């Protein structure tokens, strides 16, 4: 019997690219190289994203020769569902295993306006935010575009059972999306494409901790995707304590990049502000935050801290959260308090984490 480690080693040695990593034009180019007509790309995308088949044999309007070429060139089974947990509020957390034995978490959230999915872009994270579980083990590797796409496909398959659909997505799972920029953009274009899952750009949100060069690059992209910044502090000193990335990308420089983005795109930006008891949740912090954001086309999303066993932060009292919100509103800041979802299954903001690959036990 093969052990887990031997299976993982075999997977690494024989791994093929994921078919979900290909954009439509890339599929057309590949078909041309194979001597196949490019219109087949649309048929293949239809099987992948509309019918959501799990193997090439089900692609019945393709020749056996083409199905064999696809099978020999691309993996179609990208993720394996290990665990599926359902919260008391209907939130579902999926634990997916990757080809190399690592596992990632993806979350489906229920809203009155539809179903939203929170996707992961990396195995672990290098950013080191002091309140987040995702960074505890450091960064293991980037996900391929197809591994990000496959998260949405797998969740949509689960929703197919009740004839529901993923209507929006947020790139706020494990990892720093802008550290995996090219795969992130490939994923977004595939998901947005009319031949793909066709989720509208304005129904997608990307969040970053503040990789400044990529903010400027993102401002030049042709997708009208919503953009969020994990801010969490109104000044550089406090932000450096909470988020070490601020030592590399200073808050004043970050604000300049944000203003450029807003001016270049005309789009409103969202600032995510986690509230940590006794750290960044006082009235003076709210006043300082309002001053920092003055004149910026933005929205502030207040996030009560979620429990992480390895972290020491405590939740801000409810009355203090409301006072913080009121202080911002009184100063003209557009602000809301995020609705908590999935807290009881560790699926809320800051609680997702990558799992190590299993060690050989026999």
Swiss-Prot record:
Catalytic residue list: 105, 349
PROSITE patterns associated with the record: RADICAL_SAM (PS51918)
Binding site for S-adenosyl-L-methionine: 175-176, 207, 230-232, 306
Chain ranges of the Radical SAM core domain: 111-344
Pfam name, any one: RlmN_N
SS bond list: 118-349
Reported cofactor(s): [4Fe-4S] cluster
Primary location group: cytoplasm
Record keywords: 4Fe-4S, Cytoplasm, Disulfide bond, Iron, Iron-sulfur, Metal-binding, Methyltransferase, rRNA processing, S-adenosyl-L-methionine, Transferase, tRNA processing
Cofactor: record remark: Binds 1 [4Fe-4S] cluster. The cluster is coordinated with 3 cysteines and an exchangeable S-adenosyl-L-methionine.
Binding site for [4Fe-4S] cluster: 125, 129, 132
Compartments it resides in: Cytoplasm
GO molecular function, one term: metal ion binding
InterPro entries in alphabetical order: Aldolase_TIM (IPR013785), Methyltransferase_A (IPR040072), RlmN_N (IPR048641), RNA_MTrfase_RlmN (IPR027492), rRNA_lsu_MTrfase_RlmN/Cfr (IPR004383), rSAM (IPR007197)
EC annotation from Swiss-Prot or TrEMBL: 2.1.1.192
Record-linked Gene3D superfamilies: 1.10.150.530, Aldolase class I
Catalytic activity: adenosine(2503) in 23S rRNA + 2 reduced [2Fe-2S]-[ferredoxin] + 2 S-adenosyl-L-methionine = 2-methyladenosine(2503) in 23S rRNA + 5'-deoxyadenosine + L-methionine + 2 oxidized [2Fe-2S]-[ferredoxin] + S-adenosyl-L-homocysteine; adenosine(37) in tRNA + 2 reduced [2Fe-2S]-[ferredoxin] + 2 S-adenosyl-L-methionine = 2-methyladenosine(37) in tRNA + 5'-deoxyadenosine + L-methionine + 2 oxidized [2Fe-2S]-[ferredoxin] + S-adenosyl-L-homocysteine
Cellular component terms (Gene Ontology): cytoplasm
Function, as annotated: Specifically methylates position 2 of adenine 2503 in 23S rRNA and position 2 of adenine 37 in tRNAs.
Miscellaneous comment in the UniProt entry for this protein: Reaction proceeds by a ping-pong mechanism involving intermediate methylation of a conserved cysteine residue.
Family from the record: Belongs to the radical SAM superfamily. RlmN family.
Stated name of the protein: Probable dual-specificity RNA methyltransferase RlmN
């Amino acid at each position: 019997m093969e052990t887990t480690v031997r299976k993982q080693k075999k997977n690494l040695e024989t791994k093929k690219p994921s078919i979900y990593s290909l954009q439509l034009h890339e599929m057309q180019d590949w078909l041309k190289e194979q001597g196949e007509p490019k219109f087949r790309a649309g048929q293949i995308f239809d099987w992948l994203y509309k019918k959501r088949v799990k193997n090439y044999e089900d692609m019945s309007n393709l020749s056996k020769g083409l199905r064999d070429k696809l099978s020999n060139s691309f993996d179609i089974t990208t993720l394996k569902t290990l665990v599926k947990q359902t919260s008391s509020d209907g939130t579902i957390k999926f634990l997916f295993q990757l080809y190399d034995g690592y596992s990632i978490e993806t979350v489906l959230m229920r809203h009155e306006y539809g179903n939203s999915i929170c996707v992961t872009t990396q195995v672990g994270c290098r950013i080191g935010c002091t309140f987040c579980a995702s960074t505890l083990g450091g960064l293991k590797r980037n996900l391929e575009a197809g591994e990000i796409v496959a998260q949405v496909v797998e969740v949509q398959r689960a929703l197919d059972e009740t004839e529901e659909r993923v209507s929006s997505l947020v790139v706020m799972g494990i990892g720093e999306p802008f550290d995996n920029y090219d795969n992130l953009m490939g994923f977004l274009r595939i998901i947005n494409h009319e031949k793909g899952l066709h989720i509208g750009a304005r129904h997608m949100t990307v969040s970053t901790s503040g990789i400044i060069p990529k903010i400027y690059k993102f401002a030049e992209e042709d997708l009208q995707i919503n953009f969020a910044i994990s801010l969490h502090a109104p000044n550089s000193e406090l932000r450096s304590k909470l988020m070490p990335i601020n030592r590399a990308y200073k808050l004043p420089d970050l604000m300049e990049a944000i203003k450029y983005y807003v001016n270049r795109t005309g789009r409103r930006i969202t600032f995510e502000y986690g509230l940590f008891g006794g750290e960044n949740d006082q009235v003076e912090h709210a006043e300082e935050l309002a001053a920092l954001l003055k004149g910026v086309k933005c929205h502030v999303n207040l996030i009560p801290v979620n429990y992480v066993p390895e972290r020491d932060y405590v939740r801000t009292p409810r009355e203090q959260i409301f006072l913080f919100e009121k202080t911002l509103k009184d100063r003209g800041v557009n602000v809301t308090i995020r609705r908590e979802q999935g807290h009881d299954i560790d699926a809320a903001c800051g609680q997702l984490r990558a799992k190590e690959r299993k060690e050989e036990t026999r």
